[in-house]
């Protein structure tokens, strides 16, 4: 009888220990923050559902191509204080930009020397750039400007990452 009682007590203790260990592992799993699991790469033409705000705010590269489809592309950008995207025009496609964090100025116009449209931008602002409009976006604040951009059709090569603005400018031929 004493042996059975010791055996049952041991089984009870093992069960209790296993249960508490399982709870600890579960608690650790639920404590994972989204930023701990973000993967910065081009997810290609596969379906992709994600928190765009988390990705945009956590991106430390000047430009990261996050998704390149057949006819559309999504990039996220981190424009440092005093930097800009560089004056450019896209003749064959429109562009959508949304500011997630930071402040700056957007300029647009019909010619490289005529940027008559100028607006201040900040968190949650959207910018719609028609095909054929010259444009530039300037970070005139002391904090990074975090944004995402959608091109239709795509603008950059699959899996493009530019860690800095200088790297982006060196790759200008492909942009």
Show the residue positions of the predicted features.
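C-terminal motif of bacterial Sec signal peptides marking the signal peptidase cleavage site
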Residues: 17-20
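Conserved short histidine dyad/triad with adjacent acidic residue
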Residues: 75-92
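Positively charged n-region of N-terminal signal peptides that target proteins for export
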Residues: 1-4
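A short hydrophobic beta-strand segment most commonly corresponding to one strand
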Residues: 96, 143-158
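Short beta-strand His + acidic residue motifs that chelate non-heme Fe in jelly-roll/DSBH
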Residues: 87, 106-107, 129, 135-141
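Short acidic-glycine-tyrosine-enriched beta hairpin
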Residues: 111-131
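A short, N-terminal "cap"/entry segment at the start of jelly-roll beta-barrel domains
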Residues: 22-73, 86, 119, 162-175
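Glycine- and acidic-residue-biased ligand/ion/polar-headgroup-sensing regions
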Residues: 92-111
